[in-house]
Amino acid sequence: MTSSVIPPSPSAADYAAEGDRPLVPETDNPIGLFQDWMAQARASEPNDSNAMSLATVDADGRPDVRIVLLKGVDSEGFTFFTNLESVKGVQLAANPVAALCFHWKSQRRQVRVRGGVAPVSAAEADAYFASRAAQSRISAIASDQSRPLADRAIFEQRVAEISSVYGDDNDIPRPPHWGGFRLVPTEIEFWQDQAFRMHDRLRFYRKADGGWATVRLYP
């Protein structure tokens, strides 16, 4: 079945015009490789190079996925923030495992991550919340994220009321229903597009001693 809205598969001429792409480099530091790829994506993506799909599961084992923004990555893991009473917040509290997927079209690259999830400290959540624009903080306070909204005007009125409370005061505290999570990776897979679907895949998986092992995968 075909559709006019779906682009056709690349032709041999299309692949020839694009040229060769590098393979995923061998390394014992997948976090460092991810940071390198993120830096390259930031320089080439039109916006939100830190956007990622976050997959969770509900109490019945049904999957959910949505786009969120990565706000930190280091040897401890991948950090993001959210309303803790949102669907994802509730699901992560009940079943603290998740998967991430980054797709950078400009680089023809993808990174998949799986692992356990833990809340960040209150101090870390406070620090990030304070770094946000004042109006974004007010919006976070006002939002009952994922719950039914009878009329957008209700939300806008709530934002206006909270804004009037703080006025020009930039000291807007983090509400208790807002915080962050850190995904501690057990698997990280790097994918690089190659001609004729001969894509390159390198998977890192955590060893018992805390180090990383690698395996290349068929595309």
UniProtKB/Swiss-Prot annotation:
Q: What EC class does the entry list?
A: oxidoreductase
Q: Which SUPFAM superfamilies match?
A: FMN-binding split barrel
Q: In which pathway does it act?
A: Cofactor metabolism; pyridoxal 5'-phosphate salvage; pyridoxal 5'-phosphate from pyridoxamine 5'-phosphate: step 1/1; Cofactor metabolism; pyridoxal 5'-phosphate salvage; pyridoxal 5'-phosphate from pyridoxine 5'-phosphate: step 1/1
| Assigned EC number | 1.4.3.5
Pfam families attached to this UniProt entry: PNP_phzG_C, PNPOx_N
- Taxonomic superkingdom: Bacteria
Q: Which InterPro entries match?
A: Pyridox_Oxase (IPR000659), Pyridox_Oxase_CS (IPR019740), Pyridox_Oxase_N (IPR011576), Pyridoxamine_oxidase_dimer_C (IPR019576), Split_barrel_FMN-bd (IPR012349)
Q: Which reaction does it catalyse?
A: pyridoxamine 5'-phosphate + O2 + H2O = pyridoxal 5'-phosphate + H2O2 + NH4(+); pyridoxine 5'-phosphate + O2 = pyridoxal 5'-phosphate + H2O2
Per its UniProt record, the required cofactor names are: FMN
**Which residues are noted in the entry as FMN-binding?**
66-71, 81-82, 88, 110, 145-146, 191, 201
Q: Which PANTHER family match?
A: PYRIDOXINE-5'-PHOSPHATE OXIDASE (PTHR10851:SF0), PYRIDOXINE-5-PHOSPHATE OXIDASE (PTHR10851)
State the protein's name.
Pyridoxine/pyridoxamine 5'-phosphate oxidase
